[in-house]
Design a protein with these regions (language model features):
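N-terminal helix-cap/turn-to-beta initiation motif at the start of protein domains
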Residues: 5-21
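Contiguous, well-ordered beta-strand patches that form the walls/edges
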Residues: 26-28, 48-111
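Buried hydrophobic residues that stabilize the cores of well-folded domains
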Residues: 20-22, 37, 66, 75, ...
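Edge beta-strand at a domain terminus
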Residues: 5, 73-82, 112-131
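Flexible, solvent-exposed loop segments that connect beta-strands
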Residues: 29-44, 91-94
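Enriched but not universal
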Residues: 4-5, 28
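Short, solvent-exposed beta-strand-terminating loops
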Residues: 19-31
Length: 131
């Protein structure tokens, strides 16, 4: 089970660690914007897209909704600019048999980050600021 050891021993970059909150959401189909929302300055409908992520050194990722309720406590691995998220380490090791989700860090500065997820002809982008 060398791969599990490699995942857990790979250092998580310091600039990714900590809490991040959503500030913008974009949903595109076939490259056309369907939804383009400024989450923090919007109305209650816009705030449904708000969440907070926390990345830790032990390859755990936590997600909370706008009310502070925890949505998940999962594992992640980083390969280049791709973050793969799964329910546990086994799911990361055998993604073909389990549900995983991969997001790409498409833009990153010290205090902001954009994560993009593509599935078929649909693209979702969340912009985060460090919390």
């Amino acid at each position: 089970m060398m791969r599990a050891y490699e995942i857990m021993k790979a250092p998580v970059p310091a600039e990714l660690l900590g809490k991040w909150e959503t500030i913008h959401y974009t949903h595109m189909i076939n490259g056309e914007n369907v939804t383009d929302i400024d989450i923090l300055n919007g109305d209650e409908w816009n705030k449904q897209f708000y969440h907070t992520l926390a990345f830790s050194e032990n390859h755990k990722i936590n997600k909370w909704d706008r009310f502070g309720s925890q949505l998940y406590d999962q594992c992640f691995m980083l390969k280049g600019d791709n973050i793969t998220i799964a329910g546990n380490l086994t799911d990361l090791l055998f993604p073909q048999y389990n549900y995983t989700e991969t997001w790409t860090i498409s833009d990153k500065t010290e205090n902001s980050m954009k994560l993009t997820h593509e599935q078929g002809n649909t693209t979702e982008c969340y912009t985060y600021k460090r919390k």
